Amino acid sequence: MNLQHRIARIALIAALFLGSMPAAAESVLLTLTGAVTDGRVELTRADFDAMDWHELATSTSVTDHQPEFRGVLMRDILAHAGAEGSQVRAAALNDYVVDIPIEDFYQFDVLAALYMDGVPLTPRDKGPVWIVYPRDDHGVLADIRYDMRWVWQLVALHVQ
């Protein structure tokens, strides 16, 4: 058997083997715990895609322009998870943790943004999920207390 036939045979065996392997599980972007359905809800990109998406252009305290964010409303995420509580403890990849009143998510159109200026957010640029308040739509949101609630690299919400 010549070298070409051996390479073709190896490629065919590899393709058959790899084709029979189960697809890798989709990565979890956000985990909700506490007062949610069954005590734990893990959201993948497919879960986010199943919800209504919204766009929001607003200034931030960490950008030099007014970015346009795209994502899902925080209140829709809470509803999807069957959350019942008065606050969430938001936790980020960088170990930042802050308590946020759930009332914020009903009083304002707060986004769980996955895109900024049309580009998917990654952990290197505040993603994969960034809590974004509609700062320019409500004067009160310019207060530093709200700036502390803009959690980037969001990975978990504990509903209490």
Identify the meaning behind each predicted range.
Residues 2-11:
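Bacterial N-terminal signal peptides that target proteins for export
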Residues 24-160:
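N-terminal intrinsically disordered, low-complexity segments enriched in P/E/S/T
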Residues 10-20:
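Bacterial N-terminal signal peptides
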